[in-house]
Structure formats: C-alpha cells, structure tokens
Regions:
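Alpha-helical membrane insertion/targeting regions
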Residues: 2-286
Length: 286
C-alpha cells in the first residue's frame, strides 16, 4: 500500500498537468476561432453593405443579379423590399454577433451587452422575415429544395431570436445563453454559405453545381450551411454538464485550430478578390 502511494501521486500530478494544458489549449483555440469568425463575418457584412446597399442608393439594383441571378426583377417591389431587408439586417447581425460572445463585455458592460443584444435580436428577426417574404413572393433560384431549405432556415432564425429575447427578459440566463448560441450558429450561416461555395468551386471546379442551383451539391448546401452549425452548438451546450477527458480536449483544440486555418485562408482569398475591392470602392465614393 505504501509503495503504491508515490505512483498514484505521480499519476495524479501528470493527469493534473495534462488536464490544465488541455483546458488552456481548448480555451485559446476557441478564442482564435471566434476572433477569426468575427473578423471574417464582419468583413462579409461590410461587403453586403458595400455592394447591395450602394446599389440601392445609387438606383442600380440590377447589379444584385451580377452575383446571384434573379435577386432583382422590375415590377416585383415586395420581393425586392424583402430581400433588401434581409441583406441590410443580415449585415448587422454578421458584424455584431461575435461581440455578444465576449465574456469580459458581458461582465463589465452589461448595459452595452443588453442593448447590442436587442439590436442583434431585432436584426435577426428582420433578416428572417425579409428572406421569407422573398421566398413566398418570388421563390429562390434553386427551386423547391432551396425553397424548403431556406424557409426552414428563416423559421429557425425566428424561433431562436424570439427564444433568446424571451429567456433574457425572464432572467433565465442559462437558457438565454443556450438560445443565443443557437441564434449565432444560424446567423453566421449566410457567411459560411459563401465560404463553402467558394472553396468547393475552387477545389472541384464546381462538381455537382449547376447554373440554376438545382444540382446535387446545391441541394446539399440548401441545408448544410446551418444544420451542422446547430449540431456543433447543441453538442457544446449539452457537454458543458459533463467532465471532458484531457485528451479529448486536446483533440478538440487541434480540430478548432484546423478550422481556424481553413477560415483564415478563405477570408484572405475572398477579401483579396471580392470583399476588399467592393468595400474600398464603397468608401471611396463618400
């Protein structure tokens, strides 16, 4: 019994160090990922304002069709208003969302957190409503499958935004934070949609993609830009009540770092070729 004690103690010390290292690793990996998402999604939000909003106030709405055919059509004022609302509100949620994840802001500036949160929830509701109006009035370019996928996305946004505010107002903080994470996972979907398409077209030369967005890859993407996000967030929410083994934390940290590298590469590519020039052109016009 006495001989086994030093071995047991050494094992505990080693396990303690590994556990501490794994916690630090997962914390920093998560921080880097959230920071990358914030910067990239924020740039995409600015790009939306730069391209779509500038087309609106210059009266050149036909430019919308340069990026996605069928967004603007003369004589369809309701659909145009719906998609315009979707773009404007969507840009706001992309630029504001990651701010709400910063614990220091929530703790030190709760008033700021609440007001940004209200704007975020309102913008999420408006983005969802605008997109649903466009689908009901005109429909998406990808037909039935895209209509179903995007409509479900809009409905989930409405539910998540409503629940986020409802639980916050009632003081149910844990439930509020859980729904806020679900809302965030949905909100970055439009950004991930562009990122995924960009990488797929570059790496596979558009395999499975058709010009009318009715190919097998297009059908998959009608759901893929938000369903995996929700699954990941759901696992995160439910796993907080359980003790995670250090090696699993280290593996998760490596996975998060890989995702960060992937997003950094995509952000650099899109900013250099698309987002950056449009943003600079918009600012130079003031």
């Amino acid at each position: 019994m006495i001989k086994n004690k030093p071995v047991e103690l050494i094992g505990n010390i080693k396990y303690g160090k590994l556990e501490k290292a794994s916690m630090v690793s997962i914390r920093w990996a998560g921080f880097l990922l959230v920071t990358t998402v914030w910067i990239s999604a924020g740039l995409f939000g600015l790009y939306i304002l730069a391209f779509y909003a500038s087309s609106l106030y210059t009266g050149n709405l036909e430019r919308w069709n340069n990026l996605l055919e069928g967004l603007y059509e003369k004589g369809s004022g309701t659909a145009t208003a719906g998609i315009g609302l979707h773009f404007a509100a969507g840009a706001i949620i992309l630029m504001l969302g990651s701010i709400q994840l910063i614990g220091a802001i929530r703790e030190r500036n709760p008033l700021f957190h609440r007001w940004v949160g209200r704007l975020y929830v309102l913008s999420s509701l408006l983005a969802a409503i605008g997109g649903l109006i466009f689908i009901v009035v005109k429909g998406t370019i990808g037909g039935l499958v895209m209509n179903i996928g995007f409509s479900l996305y809009g409905l989930l946004m409405l539910i998540a935004a409503t629940e986020t505010y409802r639980h916050a107002a009632a003081g149910r903080i844990n439930k509020h934070r859980a729904w806020a994470l679900r809302l965030y996972a949905l909100a970055i979907g439009s950004w991930l949609y562009r990122m995924d398409y960009g990488f797929w077209l570059q790496l596979t030369n558009g395999f499975g993609h058709l010009h009318n967005f009715e190919g097998p890859f297009d059908s998959l993407m009608s759901f893929f830009f938000y369903v995996p996000n929700l699954l990941v967030v759901e696992i995160f929410i439910r796993s907080r009540n359980y003790k995670i083994f250090p090696l699993l934390n280290l593996f998760s940290a490596l996975l998060l770092l890989s995702m960060t590298a992937f997003l950094l590469l995509g952000t650099y590519y899109f900013t250099r070729l698309y987002w950056g020039p449009a943003i600079l052109e918009w600012f130079s016009g003031f």
